[in-house]
Curated annotation (Swiss-Prot):
Description of how the protein assembles with itself and partners: Homodimer.
Keyword list, A-Z: ATP-binding, Coiled coil, Cytoplasm, DNA-binding, Nucleotide-binding
The protein, known as: Chromosome partition protein Smc
Family that this chain belongs to: Belongs to the SMC family.
InterPro entries cross-referenced by the UniProt entry: P-loop_NTPase (IPR027417), RecF/RecN/SMC_N (IPR003395), SMC (IPR024704), SMC_hinge (IPR010935), SMC_hinge_sf (IPR036277), SMC_prok (IPR011890)
Gene: smc
Organism of this sequence: Halobacteriovorax marinus (strain ATCC BAA-682 / DSM 15412 / SJ) (Bacteriovorax marinus)
Length: 1226
């Protein structure tokens, strides 16, 4: 797994995207101090997962982002990508799967807001995934393979426990330590889960027993309901049978009328079928007719097309013939021109021969040349005379020339200034034109940057809102969970309390032994304890309990037959038993008595039976029994005295616990205090009823809370997904904003440079304009001096002209003779030019003749081509003429067939009209018969409605269909059924949905169970009574018990699994410890052996060793270094010099590499403390080991630089911005 390349952008001083390639062997990174070499090491540390900003030479992670410079703004993010070759096929986590790619690309990106992204091969990843890539490879952010600047001594100055980690990395037990740490964390979580599970298990177990009893009662009630339903359905089934019997007779009459209707319907159907066949035949003939017509039209169209094609071909033939005629005419003209040009060439050749002959007749120029020489000598003599005068003129001219030169220089300068001004003006205009467009672009890009920033801010706001919503949802969920926990706890408490009260009631504590035994031996459904029948408001419960406490275990029955009680009492005469005798009309409480009691007590007194909630079936028996018992709000001593002995009552109880009892023997009134110990039967009954209501409410609330909690959890998950998506959008928006901002800054920088250039040009233009004005003033002064010299020169020139006139005459004579000589020479040259011109004309004419010859050949080819096309066209015309005749014949035949088919279709339409008339007549007869059938149907509707009403009543009571209910327990007997209903009736009733099934089932049921109708009715009554005696039923108990039991069993299984998990985790940790100890021991010994060998090589002698501090099997033991450089005693490593420490550290690193070579190694200025000799030994070892591992060196040492295969130079061409340049060394 070797390094391939490192790509960094915006990381520390590397503003722009920089790619550093790493090849096999040794790669060096060099450059001046402070240029950013070590930033490459920091980038490697960072992308490998380093989390400490201090280790990356910064105070915080934001220090890693490009901080800007005098010229550039700070960067928006820092990004580093490390590409590794995966030649050894290492498996890594990419996305949601494990794979082994050929290249591993690790990316880490940091934004200014502190957000960090990790990616593996462009898939989002975790920091853990990146760290796992380097685990146990010897490479990584904190491994021995990367030594940062100034950290070479860290290896020797580290604590023994810290050095141990290097040996562990060699031993490959880092992953075991990570797994052990994860296992210990899992153990802690598992133990917490186990404690919570056991607490929950204990809480559920408390309520399970009470739920079991409630569930058994509910099951009994459910069984009774099913029996009630079954017998009720049987009774109603008899009613269905009677109704269907009446229906059958009525439908027999209806069937006869229907048969007649069916005969007419059959005839009508037959006619309609025939009519439909004829319609089909008509459509078929019509379709054939249309197809034939279509074919006829197609032939007609084809014929028209062919005729048009024939016309076009004839026209084409004419055009081709005209083209041939034109080409032949052109060929004739070209041949004539060719003859003319040949004659012209012959004439030009004759002229050329004549010119050449004349040119040969040369003139003798010797005499002319001697005459010219004599004139030349006389001319020179006269020239000398003139020259003397001329020197004086020249002297003046020299002075004038000086002034002229100055004037010329001024003029040149002015022209130069003018040219410069024009160039500058053009450049200024060009720059202004260029940056006028750039300003618009910059404004647009500013808008784009602003838009990107607004989008980023908007996305940030959305992200913030989503975070707030998620926090609110989490808070709401916590509140819901708290409420749910509170309600669940309250529900469990109340269910437990209810169960206890029901168990107390079921145990019949305080009930006479005789009553208990009696209820156990007889049918308990017919007898009830009076205390179980009494219910009242909570305010009166205490008073009712005091008033009726002596009668709470009295037996009550709705049955007037008391023989069973008497018989039991005879058999068990030693057991006490109270039984409420059959009804006796109460005659104690009259309106007069009640009025007297109200006067005595101040009006606030009520008969007790008016305050009780009694079952309907017991009211007739219990109300007389309670006659004479009253409840008053309160009474004191005065009230007691005001009640006369003559007032008839049995007892009066106040709500505050006082009791007035009248002695039935002597009529005396006694004052008593009610019992205040414990809870009475009435209060317990009230409490049970209240608890059942509260439990029902709590169950609804718990269910709603669970639903709300589930919905909010779903919303929370959706919001979290939205937040993740929003973060991705925000990341993209921020990157887009940073890119656009960078582009804007670049353009602004370019515009700023352009503006600077523009200012310089404008300033230069002003300077040139000023210099030009100064030059114009100087030119005026020169002009005045020149005028003065011109006057003096004019006088000299007059004398010179006189002398020079003679010289001119001589020159004229000389020139005349010389011109004559030159004319002869020109004439000869003219002859030569004419010869050349004639030769050129001959060549041009030959060229034109060649072109004409080619044109003639081309025309011949075209004429041949057109002749061939004419022959082809003539063949096509002949073919078309033959084809057109055939199509015209076929068109005529199709017209004949169309006429015949139209006649046949007319005959068919007439036959169809006759059948339609007959169908109309039958329809009238059917309509009249249907009216008669409707009258019959009205007569039997009532029977059907009654049958439906019975079925409907059963459905309303039990939500089932009576037909299905009967079908569930009846068997069919086809023979008996056929005896009852004949074939015609069966056929008729099959047309009515479900009617046969109902009647068949009703008959079958009546045949088999008719004699048991009375028994079914009695059973129905008994089941209803037994169901009513069960009292309040907790229907939820069955489901609650099953759910709680299932949950309890599930928790038991979970408990076993958690305990097993704890055992497995502890076993795994022990296994990890044993394996780690074994590997560490082996690795330590191997590194120690290599260290003993490498140390003398590095130092050129001496000895060294590694030593374990403590027991080597102790997982916390450290590693110490004992070293003895050459000529020194064995000493502690901390006493060594800086260079010796560095050499010792290098020895240790190379020793580790010999045991377990890392795929790559990065050394940052490790050779800085070493002298030349030690650098040489260091380089030799480095060269030997580079065959197994990649080495990246940051160095200032020239010898080390020579060792590198590839060299990167890091520079700062601009302040604060690093750049890297690579050189391949051989």
């Amino acid at each position: 797994m070797k390094l391939k390349r490192l790509v960094i952008q915006g990381f520390k001083s590397f503003k722009d995207r920089t790619t550093i390639h790493f090849d096999d062997g040794i790669t060096g990174i060099v450059g001046p101090n402070g240029c950013g070499k070590s930033n490459i090491v920091d980038a490697l540390f960072w992308v490998m997962g380093e989390q400490s900003a201090k280790h990356l030479r910064g105070k915080s992670m934001k220090d890693l982002i490009f901080a800007g410079s005098s010229k550039y703004n700070p960067g928006a993010y820092a990004e580093a990508t490390l590409v590794l070759g995966n030649d050894d096929g290492k498996h890594i986590h990419i996305g949601n799967k494990v794979s082994s790619p050929s290249e591993i690309q690790l990316t880490r990106k940091l934004y200014r807001n502190g957000e960090t992204e990790y990616r593996i091969n462009n898939y989002p990843a975790r920091l853990k995934d990146i760290q796992e890539v380097f685990m146990d490879t010897g490479a990584g952010a904190k491994s021995y393979s990367i030594i940062a600047q100034g950290e070479i001594n860290r290896l020797v100055q580290a604590k023994p426990e810290e050095r141990r980690t290097m040996i562990e990395e060699v031993a490959g037990i880092t992953k075991f330590k990570v797994r052990k740490k994860e296992s210990l964390k899992k153990i802690e979580q598992t133990e917490q889960n186990l404690n919570r599970l056991q607490d929950l298990q204990s809480e559920i177990e408390k309520n399970l027993k009470a739920l079991q009893k409630q569930a058994e009662k509910a099951e009994r009630a459910r069984s009774l309901k099913e029996k009630i339903k079954r017998n009720d359905i049987i009774v109603h089934a008899h009613k269905v049978y009677d109704l269907l019997k009446d229906l059958r007779d009525g439908k027999t009459l209806l069937n006869e009328k229907t048969l007649e209707l069916e005969g007419w319907g059959t005839r009508k159907n037959s006619l309609e079928i025939s009519l439909e066949e004829e319609r089909f035949k008509k459509e078929e003939q019509t379709e054939k007719l249309e197809i034939l017509q279509k074919e006829r039209n197609e032939i007609s169209t084809q014929l028209a097309t062919a005729e048009e094609r024939f016309s076009n071909l004839c026209k084409t033939l004419t055009d081709k013939e005209n083209l041939i005629e034109t080409r032949q005419k052109e060929m004739t003209e070209l041949e004539e021109e060719l003859v003319e040009r040949e004659e012209k060439i012959k004439a030009l050749e004759d002229s050329l021969v004549e010119l050449q002959t004349r040119n040969e007749e040369t003139v003798n120029f010797e005499e002319v040349e001697e005459k010219i020489e004599l004139l030349k000598e006389r001319l020179e003599l006269k020239t000398d005379q003139v020259d003397t005068l001329k020197e004086e003129i020249e002297l003046k001219k020299s002075e004038l020339n000086t002034l002229s030169q100055a004037a010329f220089q001024n003029t040149s300068k002015l022209e130069e200034y003018a040219a410069n001004l024009q160039d500058i003006t053009e450049e200024i205009e060009a720059l202004e034109k260029q940056y006028s467009g750039v300003s618009t672009q910059i404004a647009d890009e500013r808008d784009a940057v602003h838009t990107a920033q607004e989008l980023s801010e908007k996305l940030t706001e959305v992200e913030s809102e989503l975070k707030s919503e998620i926090e609110e949802l989490i808070s709401a969920n916590k509140e819901l969970d708290a409420k749910l926990k509170e309600k669940s706890k309250s529900l469990i408490t109340k269910e437990s309390k209810l169960s206890s009260l029901q168990e107390i009631a079921a145990a019949m504590d305080g009930v006479r032994e005789g009553a208990v035994e009696f209820l156990e031996t007889v049918d308990s459904d017919k007898y009830q304890l009076l205390g179980n029948l009494i219910q009242c408001e909570e305010d009166h419960a205490k008073a009712v309990q005091n008033l009726l406490s002596d009668f709470m275990d009295t037996l009550v029955s709705t049955d007037e037959d008391v023989s069973a009680v008497i018989e039991w009492c005879k058999t068990n005469n030693d057991k006490a038993l109270e039984f409420l005798a059959p009804n006796k009309n109460g005659d104690i409480t009259s309106e007069e008595t009640l009025e007297r009691l109200r006067v005595a007590t101040g009006g606030d007194i009520t008969p007790v039976h008016e305050l009780l909630n009694l079952p309907e079936e017991y009211k007739s028996k219990l109300i007389p029994f309670f006659d004479g018992y009253f409840i008053a709000s309160k009474f004191d001593q005065e009230v007691f005295k005001s009640i006369s002995d003559s007032i008839r009552f049995k007892a009066i109880s106040s709500t505050d616990g006082k009791l007035l009892v009248k002695n039935p023997g002597n009529g005396k009134i006694l004052t008593m205090s009610g019992s205040s110990e414990g809870q009475g039967v009435v209060e317990r009954n009230n409490q049970i009823q209240e608890l059942e209501k509260e439990i029902e409410v709590l169950r609804v609330e718990v269910a709603e809370l669970e639903t709300n909690s589930g919905e909010k959890s779903l919303v929370l998950e959706q919001k979290r997904d939205s937040l993740e998506e929003q973060r991705n959008l925000l990341s993209e928006a921020r990157a887009d904003h940073a890119a656009k901002k960078s582009a804007l800054e670049s353009k602004l920088s370019g515009m700023e440079s352009g503006n600077t250039r523009l200012e310089i040009l404008k300033k230069r233009k002003q300077e040139i304009s000023k210099s030009r004005l100064d030059m114009l003033e100087s030119e005026d002064s020169l002009s005045k001096n020149k005028s003065s010299l011109d006057e003096e020169l004019e006088e000299l020139s007059t004398r010179f002209e006189e002398e020079n006139a003679e010289l001119a005459d001589l020159k004229s004579t000389y020139e005349t003779e010389r011109e004559a000589y030159m004319e002869k020479q020109v004439e000869i040259n003219t002859f030569k030019e004419r010869v050349s011109g004639i030769q050129s004309q001959i060549e041009d004419i030959n060229s034109q003749m060649d072109k004409q010859t080619a044109r003639i050949a081309s025309n011949k080819e075209l004429i041949e081509k057109y002749n061939e096309e004419i022959e082809t066209t003539n063949d096509q015309i002949d073919t078309l003429e033959s084809s057109n005749q055939e199509m015209a014949s076929e068109l005529s035949e199709r017209d004949d067939v169309l006429g015949i088919m139209k006649d046949d279709l007319t005959q068919l339409l007439l036959a169809m009209q006759e059948r339609e008339d007959e169908v109309k007549e039958l329809s009238k007869k059917i309509a009249k018969n249907e009216k008669d059938i409707t009258e019959y149907e009205l007569k039997i509707n009532q029977w059907q409605n009654d049958e439906v009403e019975v079925v409907k009543n059963i459905f309303e009571k039990y939500q089932i269909d009576l037909r299905e209910a009967i079908g569930g327990f009846l068997e069919y007997d086809q023979d008996d059924f056929d005896d009852l209903i004949d074939t015609r009736q069966m056929h008729f009733m099959e047309t009515e949905n479900g009617l046969v099934t109902i009647e068949k089932q009703s008959y079958e049921f009546h045949r088999r169970y008719g004699q048991d109708l009375k028994e079914c009715s009695n059973k129905l009554k008994n089941y209803k009574n037994e169901y009513n005696r069960l009292g309040e039923i907790n229907w939820q108990a069955i489901e609650d018990y099953d759910r709680q039991k299932l949950r309890f069993d599930f928790l038991r299984v979970q408990e076993v699994e958690l305990k097993q998990s704890l055992e497995d985790l502890e076993t795994a940790i022990n296994h990890i410890d044993e394996k780690s100890k074994e590997r560490f021991k082996i690795a330590f010994e191997e590194v120690d052996v290599r260290f003993r060998k490498v140390f003398p090589i590095i130092f050129g002698g001496g000895e060294a060793m590694l030593k374990v501090t403590g027991d080597i099997n102790d997982s916390e033991c450290g590693v110490d270094i004992i070293a003895k450089p050459p000529g020194k005693k064995m000493q502690n490593i901390n006493l060594m010099s800086g260079g010796e420490k560095a050499m010792t550290a290098v020895s240790l690193i190379f020793s580790i590499f010999l045991v377990k070579p890392s795929p790559f190694c990065l050394l940052d200025e490790v050779d800085a403390p070493l002298d030349d000799a030690n650098v040489g030994r260091f380089n030799e070892l480095l060269r030997e080991m580079s065959s197994d591992s990649q080495f990246i060196l940051i160095t200032h040492n020239k010898k080390t630089m020579e060792l590198n295969d590839t060299l990167y130079g890091v520079t700062m061409q601009e302040p604060g911005v690093s750049k890297a340049v690579s050189v391949q060394l051989h």
